[in-house]
Amino acid sequence: MSEQHNIPPLDDWRRQGQEKYLKGVKLVFRQYKPYRKEWDHDHCEFCGAKFSQNEGDLNEGYSTEDGYRWICSECFNDFKEEFSWQVEE
């Protein structure tokens, strides 16, 4: 029996227009690294979870190829079908 994944409803609180800039993009699963040296953290583009190199924060997840935008694993799994993401190994 295959597991069917449900796409989050249109009124899901995490939806904030991300389809304008994240639909169909290539993502890379990797350890968190700040986009700029003066930055110490980033947030999930959907739920706002904190990514950093500090204990207690998310230390890995999916990012755009340039490392600018980050998506936590939970939100990635919830939105991957709808957003048609391609994951680079």
Name every feature range the model reports, one short phrase each.
Residues N54-N59, E82-S84:
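Short Cys/His-rich "knuckle" micro-motifs
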Residues V25-H43, Y62-D66:
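Short, flexible, mixed-charge glycine/proline-rich loop motifs
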Residues G67-E89:
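Short metal-binding segments enriched for Cys and/or His
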Residues C44-G48, C72-C75:
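Short cysteine-rich clusters marking metal-coordination/redox-active sites
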Residues H5-N6, Y32, S63-T64, F76-D78:
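Intrinsically disordered, low-complexity regions enriched in Ser/Pro/Gly/Gln/His and often acidic
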Residues M1-P34:
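N-terminal alpha-helical interaction blocks
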